[in-house]
């Protein structure tokens, strides 16, 4: 935690800021609290504001959204906690005024810079009305960048989260039964990680007949469709260890081996994963990872989901989305994006997800990794092979 605060205060000094105002929400199973969590260790079930002064001798304050959440927040937070009230921006303004920053410069850290999710409009209006001479600078993207390289302690937490995620993935393959509705699989996934001491984060899945596929990515909402012999279940699963998450993608084949078309798609994904894992090393640029995955395009597939993304508590750079398909088949002479270079100890999800051009068939094969000198180290123990369920 001392390292994190040091990095945050260095950011404030670079921008001549007297404090940061950090906003979080409970979206995505509390993982939209990532920026607040990083400086407090608290994952709130509602909204939060952290007022983080630049001066190390001045106490920060975490304002939680609901009064009855204050006692629990005080048990987990490493900074003092107060209720933000029904006008939390007024509480933030009062704190800034007490710090002598009513006419100063503060940095705003929102939820997610990629999608422009900052503090709510009404809160911002209230803050401006209370402190009309306050200068607010958005530093969300730069702050999120501080979290990209993981500490030794964070990597240890990610290993635990990966093991919890493996437990959930294994439970799907072992417990799925013919006639079971999809939504029961969600209970299996979340129940397995909960029983092992984890928290649910992501449980996306889609079941369909191997010989009549009708979807290329796992669904965010399980249906009441009943599992049948000869089905494939495509998955994306993350379980968390107090904020830090693993992520795994494996297809599960029910009561039958993969058909030739599914086997070919799986083998393409596996080859792409291996090449990408070798390319994801310190100093690697985005174009090198796109080139490593070009086997997907060379075999007539595209992708739908991200090819890789930074991870840990939430998704952050580096991110390579489906626009990379425009560079396949690979041509060394054609310009390709550079993007942020990969750094040692970044946590990155590698997830080749080949889909057919008509987007009726697809699978994901991936894992959370940590960047090391020799390439990406997979944190998961589930084999890179089709999972067979007896059904």
Enumerate the language-model features and the residues they cover:
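Active-site neighborhoods and metal-handling regions in enzymes and metal-associated proteins
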Residues: 1-391
């Amino acid at each position: 935690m001392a390292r994190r605060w040091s990095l945050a205060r260095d950011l404030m000094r670079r921008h001549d800021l007297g404090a940061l105002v950090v906003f979080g929400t409970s979206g995505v199973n509390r993982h939209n609290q990532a920026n607040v969590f990083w400086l407090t260790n608290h994952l709130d079930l509602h909204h939060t504001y952290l007022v983080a002064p630049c001066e190390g001798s001045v106490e920060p304050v975490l304002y939680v959204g609901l009064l009855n959440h204050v006692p629990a927040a005080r048990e987990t937070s490493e900074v003092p906690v107060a209720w933000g009230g029904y006008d939390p921006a007024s509480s933030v303004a009062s704190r800034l005024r007490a710090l002598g920053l009513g006419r100063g410069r503060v940095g705003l850290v929102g939820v997610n810079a990629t999608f422009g999710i900052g503090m709510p409009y009404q809160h911002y209006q209230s803050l401006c009305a209370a402190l009309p001479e306050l200068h607010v600078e958005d530093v969300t993207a730069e702050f999120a960048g501080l979290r990209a390289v993981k500490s030794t302690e964070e990597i240890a937490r990610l290993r635990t989260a990966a093991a919890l995620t493996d437990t959930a993935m294994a439970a799907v393959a072992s417990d799925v039964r013919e006639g079971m509705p999809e939504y029961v699989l969600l209970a299996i996934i979340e129940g397995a990680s909960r029983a092992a001491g984890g928290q649910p984060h992501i449980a996306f899945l889609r079941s369909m007949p191997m010989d009549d596929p009708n979807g290329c990515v796992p669904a965010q909402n399980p249906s009441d469709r009943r599992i049948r012999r000869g089905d494939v279940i495509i998955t994306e699963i993350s379980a968390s260890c107090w904020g830090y998450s693993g992520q795994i993608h494996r297809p599960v084949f029910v009561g039958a081996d993969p058909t030739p078309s599914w086997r070919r798609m799986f083998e393409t994904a596996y080859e792409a994963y291996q090449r990408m894992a070798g390319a994801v090393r310190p100093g690697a640029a985005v174009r090198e990872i796109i080139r490593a995955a070009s086997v997907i395009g060379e075999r007539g597939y595209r992708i739908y989901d991200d090819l890789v993304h930074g991870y840990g508590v939430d998704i952050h750079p580096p991110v390579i989305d489906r626009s990379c398909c425009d560079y396949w088949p690979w041509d060394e002479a054609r310009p390709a994006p550079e993007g942020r270079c990969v750094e040692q100890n970044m946590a990155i999800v590698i997830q080749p997800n080949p889909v057919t051009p008509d987007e009726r068939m697809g699978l994901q094969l991936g894992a959370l990794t940590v960047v090391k000198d020799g390439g990406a180290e997979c944190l998961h123990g589930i084999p890179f092979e089709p999972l067979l369920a007896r059904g």
